[in-house]
Amino acid sequence: MPYFGICVLFLTVIEGEKREEKDMFEKVNAIVELVNGKVWGWGMIVLLFGTHIFLTIRTGFIQKASITKGIKLSVTKDEGAEGEVSQFGALTTALASTIGTGNIIGVGTAVAMGGPGAVLWCWLTGVFGIATKYAESLIAVKYRVKTKDGRMQGGAMYALERGLNMRWLGVIFAVLAGFASFGIGCATQVNAIATVCQENLGIPPWIVGIVIAVLTAVVIFGGIKSIANVCEKLVPFMAIFYVLGCLIILGINYDFIIPAIVTICKLAFTPGAAAGGLVGGGLRLAIQYGVARGLFSNESGMGSAPIAAAAAQTRNPVRQALVSSTGTFWDTVVVCLMTGLVLVTTIMKNPAINADEIANGGVLTSMAFAQIPYIGPVILVVGIISFAFSTVLGWAYYGERCVEYFAGKKGLVPYRVLYVVVAAIAPVVSLNLVWLIADTLNALMAIPNLIAVLLLSPIVVKETKKYINNLDAVDDTPVPVVETGHGQRKAKG
């Protein structure tokens, strides 16, 4: 299995720390940082943001329908339609993977590294990213397949294979997404849980790793229905709980909200310093970290959420695409924006905060929530634990579908075991290195998906025109039946 390499990487880092081989570790970190800088250069930023804008125009600003129709559809059920889980179950599974530490620590890191201006770029990535999430979800449902045992499978790999006859690129996407699941989906999340538990509850990281690993194993060995059942209950609770905490802080920092908005908008387009301890990271860094953390947060363009969308019971592709696109609205347009405002208002309110504290996204977030008497730290701890654990579950499902695509069902058990192992060892791995690796893999897996979305945009437009004003219409196109997750090669009928 190619995933053995990711485990070896983490074990190597751990062993290096134990032996105090700091030089080797620093070299590895420097190499990963260099690669990350190249991958997240202007080319990737233009490709991602350009795709968002292109699809916004091609779909006639689908964001309006996403908010007005998609939110309403997300709580309805298409019980007579084909699929494994409800539309709401598919949405919450996708939200479980997107509303994670990227919304809390990730935004803090963006502000720390890119300055306050990164918040606006993160938000804009979400606004325009709604169109991309819509398009990638539409083609995922359009080109999904059904296994002999009745499971629905879809995603960028199937769209590339069945829609563009590019199975080779579908395999590349599946492999990269499988690797990415260990980073964005597992290691970063468990590491964040371990950090907050150690700092606030005094629990040793290795104990946290074992507990999370056991809980993860119990759920993921139950399949998509088990994951969806947990997410349907967990996601609404954690989102409301966290948003209420943010609203309380913004109420405390009321006088600094308008100045914070002005500062964010100003530094998003011009380099320079701001008042109150804030440092402008420069235009390039503001855009780079804003867009990168926006992708980490909402995953629009990565091709991950459509894997869950493909399993939904839905009458037609447009119906589920609208539901899935609302995930980006809730994740980035609402949650990330509120986090950004909380952080920037906190820094402006406390100009004595030193540069080292601002440079640490996690510490910065902790300071912001500490403003709420007594329960502030509790809200942050509960928020990070619930957000992160739900992400671990959602990405486990994504990884499984990708592994099954290129390796068949025989690869599922080894993948699950390795996923649990990574969860167990993640708390003792360098957080900075883990985030760098995750960022790099996110960009790499996004490239094949963006190619699929752009080349299949005529199909997206055609399907949108067909169903957008007739959402109750049923798409009676037969779904191909496959023997395994190997796509069209073994399709029947």
Task: Spell out what each predicted region is.
Residues 47-54, 58-71, 191-197, 204-265, ...:
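Membrane-interface loop-to-helix entry segments
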Residues 25-28, 59-63, 102-107, 183-194, ...:
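Transmembrane helix-loop junctions in multi-pass membrane proteins
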Residues 45-50, 86-94, 166-180, 210-211, ...:
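Select transmembrane alpha-helical segments in multipass membrane proteins
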Residues 51, 55-56, 125-150, 156-191, ...:
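Helix-loop-helix module between adjacent transmembrane segments
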Residues 61-87, 109-111, 115-119, 123, ...:
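Flexible loop linkers connecting adjacent transmembrane helices
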Residues 80-113, 139-157, 161-162, 175-178, ...:
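Alpha-helical membrane segments and immediately flanking helix-loop junctions
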Residues 136-143, 247-263, 271, 275-278, ...:
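Extracellular/periplasmic helix-exit of transmembrane alpha-helices
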Residues 3-4, 9-10, 17, 24-101, ...:
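N-terminal alpha-helical transmembrane segments of multi-pass membrane transport
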